[in-house]
């Protein structure tokens, strides 16, 4: 996956949040 998504996930955000943030 992309770094943005990995970083988002490590921050404790859920999948949908990371898709919106990084998509």
Curated annotation (Swiss-Prot):
Modified residues (Cysteine amide): 22
Keywords: Amidation, Antimicrobial, Disulfide bond, Fungicide, Ion channel impairing toxin, Neurotoxin, Potassium channel impairing toxin, Secreted, Toxin, Voltage-gated potassium channel impairing toxin
Recorded GO CC terms: extracellular region
Disulfide bonds: 4-22, 8-18
Cellular compartment(s): Secreted
Modifications the protein undergoes after translation, according to the UniProt entry: The two disulfide isomers globular (C1-C3, C2-C4) and beads (C1-C2, C3-C4) do not show activity on Kv10.1/KCNH1/EAG1.
Site (Basic residue of the functional dyad): 19
Gene Ontology molecular function, alphabetical: potassium channel regulator activity; toxin activity
UniProt-listed GO biological process terms: defense response to fungus; killing of cells of another organism
Site (Aromatic residue of the functional dyad): 5
Pfam family, one: Toxin_25
Tissues and organs where the protein is expressed, per its UniProt entry: Expressed by the venom gland.
Keyword DNA repair: no
InterPro entries, alphabetized: Toxin_25 (IPR012630)
UniProt domain comment: Has the structural arrangement of two alpha-helices stabilized by disulfide bonds (CSalpha/alpha 2(S-S)).
Family: Belongs to the short scorpion toxin superfamily. Potassium channel inhibitor kappa-KTx family. Kappa-KTx 1 subfamily.
Official protein name in the record: Potassium channel toxin kappa-KTx 1.2
Organism: Chersonesometrus fulvipes (Indian black scorpion)
